[in-house]
Amino acid sequence: MDDCGPSTGLFHPYEYKLAKKISECVPSVEMFRMLGSGTEACMCAVRVARLATGHKNIIKMGGAYHGWSDQLAWGMRVPGTLNLQSHGVPMFVFKHTQEFFPNDLKDLEKKLIINKFRGGTAAVFIEPCGPESATRPVDKDFPKGVQAL
């Protein structure tokens, strides 16, 4: 607080130092950006994925939590509550968001194929340990299967 004030919205020298250290430890990291929350990181990931791929659709694992942004609230629910967690979000916001069943690579593959005719898939969001904070674990090889698709 003494050095930079109460707002961390602007870059700070320590962000640069951290980015440099991460690049040294993980040479494949070409760019690095600090963000304020996981929600913000997921929102940025959607935007960067769409920019990088030129595609518009996002597919996410059903029941998985990826922050509170409107588009990623689809499929975020406590079992038995329908879409209670996404109340207040107009349905049109989910036009380019789909979900697939956890542990079901065939369901994901089907959605990827369909999206080839609907503007392509920009990104697939998963929780590698399983949805609902890993209370519904997925097979240990599931993330590799997603990556292969």
Write out the residue ranges for each language-model feature.
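Conserved residues at the C-terminal ends of beta-strands
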Residues: 7, 35, 61, 100, ...
